[in-house]
UniProtKB/Swiss-Prot annotation:
Top-level lineage group: Bacteria
Family label: Belongs to the QueA family.
Subcellular location: Cytoplasm
Organism taxonomic ancestry: Bacteria, Pseudomonadati, Pseudomonadota, Betaproteobacteria, Burkholderiales
Protein name in the entry: S-adenosylmethionine:tRNA ribosyltransferase-isomerase
Entry annotated with the keyword Protein biosynthesis: no
Catalytic activity, as annotated: 7-aminomethyl-7-carbaguanosine(34) in tRNA + S-adenosyl-L-methionine = epoxyqueuosine(34) in tRNA + adenine + L-methionine + 2 H(+)
Swiss-Prot/TrEMBL GO biological process terms: queuosine biosynthetic process; tRNA wobble guanine modification
Main location per the UniProt record: cytoplasm
Encoding gene per record: queA
Amino acid sequence: MLTLSDFDFDLPPELIAQTALPDRTASRLLAVRRTEDAVHFEDRQFADLVDYLRPGDLLVFNDTRVIKARFFGHKASGGKVEVLVERLLDEHTVLAQIRSSKSPVEGTSLRLADAFDVTVGPRAEPFFTLRFPQPALDLIEQYGRLPLPPYIEHDPDSFDETRYQTVYARNPGAVAAPTAGLHFDDALFAKLDAMGIRRGFLTLHVGAGTFQPVRVENIAEHRMHSEWYEITPELAEAIRATRAAGGRVIAVGTTSMRALESAAQPDGTLNACSGETDIFITPGYRFRAVDLLVTNFHLPKSTLLMLVSAFAGMSAIREAYQHAIAQRYRFFSYGDAMLLTRAPTEPGEPGEPGETQSL
């Protein structure tokens, strides 16, 4: 049985990146290479990612756009509230987390940003529904604050509003950035295009649940949060063509990974689809759609650390994180990146053996 403690590690707090680097591709890249008998670590710059890719490979990006989902306000009684929009339900209605001394009552109003009132609707545990007086997305973008992760200790500024978005973000709805994509810029895309490396896009609107801690020691008892995703016919066809030509499918970020694996059939094929996913990937999972993964460094005891451990192998991830800490890599959303290959199941780890991939 895998326990939460299996995914714990000590991280010096000064390694938690508090700001993004001015140059997106100046971040570091830890390439984790696997041979038959060993795991090797290569310390590179993110721009060196091109050295590990081949013509005909397909990079799959999540094109969700972070919305300004955080509001401060008050009840009619004067009590303070903090609202974090979780997702847009329709043009005027959202699902939101609300922090206040007492839960607001259905039918009452909240004044947000000293600018407009929202009406509290039915509870949808652990969220509330809120009705906006005008199109919600318009008011969110005009009056909301960028929802930086809880471990980033400064208030969001104009630099964050640029750097906590990917350069290709186009579908608004996320409350957290797909952070592996933050390392790509237009110059790197031009280089990838010149090499014959293809790009595909999906959408998964990242919810605040991505930051929720796992509260059970037996991880099999954890209930995963649900997020909306969409695989377009164009992406499904690009993946089919890549496979047919012998290319590799490379997920940029764990959100792309979760969407692809949610849509994949047992034989590895994908069809266009959209809907909710609460896929929880832990060691023992047999991957169907993804060969390589670009990802940042994740929080101790997090579901994302479990995902990368499932993909690259628990011992490889433990060693990689120890190496990254020793080499003073920057961690979490504004931190550095890793390039991981899919590993066969390791001896003593649950699950079926799978085909390994090489860089």
